[in-house]
């Protein structure tokens, strides 16, 4: 199992609307989920991935637990596994966010996303192989964007198609560090604050004072 990128031979799966997963889960689906859970734990530096990103056109995503349960104090390598997830905006407020993607290595983009969303899904419990229906609201920057990004994958969409601005990852982080060292921005600045700022600097040439 490996991540499918936009340069992979089987990249077509990234642009296909994923199939709804049968509930209750079949034995085959549970075996696939277990294989993906093990794969998820094998690499670092991820917020999560949607199943089409590993070559399967099914509506399942795996994400870091602390992004699903924002009250968690510590991180774990066990993913939260969501089946047939969907989201909807619960306010009209949008902000520019900076995003990257395992399927588009070496790039980051500025994308407009809703700030406040409601997530609905079946939560899979790997220890018991049971499902429970969940509905949660998210108002934090990273989590609210995550659901939009990952569920886009289930709709055959990749963030670069929505990006207002696309940059090389190395150039972005180098530029960000220059801005920090010059005192133009703060190192802990939220992405919803950094996104529009980077856009203004690169596109409009407006350097913050």
UniProtKB/Swiss-Prot annotation:
Keywords: Hydrolase, Iron, Metal-binding, Protein biosynthesis. One of its GO terms (biological process) is translation. Coiled coil: none annotated. GO terms for molecular function: metal ion binding; peptide deformylase activity. Its cofactor is Fe(2+). Fe cation binds at residues 101, 149, 153. Belongs to the polypeptide deformylase family. PANTHER family: PEPTIDE DEFORMYLASE. This is Peptide deformylase 2. The gene is def2.
């Amino acid at each position: 199992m490996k991540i499918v990128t936009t340069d992979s031979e089987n990249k077509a799966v990234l642009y296909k609307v994923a199939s709804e997963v049968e509930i209750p889960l079949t034995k085959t689906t549970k075996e696939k989920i277990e294989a993906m859970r093990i794969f998820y734990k094998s690499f670092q530096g991820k917020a999560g991935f949607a199943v089409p990103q590993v070559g399967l056109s099914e509506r399942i995503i795996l994400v870091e637990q602390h992004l699903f349960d924002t009250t968690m104090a510590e991180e774990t390598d066990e993913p939260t596994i969501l089946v047939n997830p969907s989201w909807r905006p619960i306010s009209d407020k949008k902000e520019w966010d900076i995003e990257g993607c395992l399927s588009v290595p070496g790039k980051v983009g500025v994308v407009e996303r809703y700030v406040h969303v409601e997530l609905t899904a079946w939560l899979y419990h790997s220890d018991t192989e049971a499902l429970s229906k969940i509905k949660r609201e998210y108002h934090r920057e990273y989590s609210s964007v995550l659901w939009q990004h990952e569920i886009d994958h289930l709709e055959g969409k990749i963030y670069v198609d929505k990006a207002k601005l696309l940059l090389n990852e190395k150039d972005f982080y180098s530029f960000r560090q220059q801005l920090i060292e010059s005192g133009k921005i703060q190192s802990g600045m939220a992405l919803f604050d950094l996104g529009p700022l980077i856009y203004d600097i690169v596109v409009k040439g407006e350097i913050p004072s």
